[in-house]
Amino acid sequence: MPRLHNGPALVIGFMFLFAQGASAQAQQSMKHGGSMQVPQSASPKDTPAKTALPIAVSPPVCPAGQPFDPVVNMCMAHGTMPMPVLTFSLNQFAVYSTTSGPRGQSRVTGPGVGMLMYNQPLSPKNTLRVKIMGTAEQLTVGDKGTPQLFQTENIDNMHPHDYLMALEFRDVIKLGAGDDQELTFLLAPRGAAATGPVPFMHRASAEGNPDAPLGHNLQDGFHDVSTVLGIAYRNSGTTVEATGFSGHAISWPFPLHKVDSYSVRVTQKIDDHVLIGASYADVLSPDDAGGAEHEKFVTGWLATTHTLDRATLKSSFIWGQVRVGHDPALNSFLAEAVYQRGMNKLYGRGEILQITPSQLDLVPPDGSTDAKWVKALTLGYERTLVEKGPFSLFFGGSFTRDFAPVEFRPDYGSAPRGAKLYFRIKVGSSSAMRDGM
């Protein structure tokens, strides 16, 4: 039940409304009579008794989109206050993975991520957004990781993420009369830096694919970093972002570190079907000798979404580059897409990237330390088994053919490959809450 804290103010407001009504009646009388007529004195019996009528005060005519609020007796310049919204989502796999060759492995793992988002309006033009993202991969994947040849951070396996991947607080301020302009301030003990496209685990063009891209460290590897401060400005389809963050390795739970790295990102929505973007990051990363070195990341991407008859096609094309100190730059190229028609999905991914022998803990026969080009092609299929409200259950499988350079074949074989079978659970729900939480 709403509480009234300003009793005197309401009384004064009522008196003000009463005075306005009386003034309006006087002006109406002057319009009809030319001037106010002072009545002659009359005896009580000559003047019939009249009952006082309530004064009706019509609300003012407000501009479009600005409703009248009778409580405060004024037009609400920015519309009514929206309700708080709580959103939960989960994307969880149970995967059997097998890879071939001298480094081949087979294992069951459970990669996945869950996210909780809360939007609390502070005013009609100001919203606080809180995002918490976490995973159980430390338990469901473990230190060994998910088998995948040519992954470099956890060699030949996709590493598990930390329990807490994001704890972000955003203050979003609408500018101007409409919704075209926004200014956002970001504070995150753990969160995403403004680098690269949407991370692979959230990317629409990677829906259903349990594999991480081999080049994800060059393309979107800073989706969970420490001590992030940021600002973003959006004007219609154009968004410009800047973040400062720590290049220090993240650890549990989420200790804060010195902000020693920065990034900038620009995205442009061409229309409802095409989006392009580019980013640059200078990261001070710890090295093996106990010091730190600057790593410079440049990324560009194109994302598309199209409806074809009763099907959808979503695709991404990504280029990422990193240069460590004065070393030669390493490049990665990715093209991926998912085609969905009814309960069926077909997805694919092709990658070409440069990998050094040291990244894979290799010693080539010729002793070369130069980066070599590695290629990978993945094709997969996913079927929706259950779809009920916010809950969906899928079953799928994928096959990957890797193409190793000659120098890497003693350790990987002449035709390295991998396969996966999996179940996937997806949950997404949203609720608006009256009167807050």
What name fits each language-model region?
Residues 24-99, 104-105, 117-125, 131-133, ...:
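N-terminal periplasmic/intermembrane-space "pro-region" immediately following the signal or transit peptide
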Residues 92-100, 134-140, 187-193, 235-237, ...:
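Transmembrane beta-strands of outer-membrane beta-barrel pores
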Residues 379, 413-437:
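Outer-membrane beta-barrel "beta-signal"
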Residues 95-101, 141-267:
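Surface-exposed coil loops of outer-membrane beta-barrel proteins
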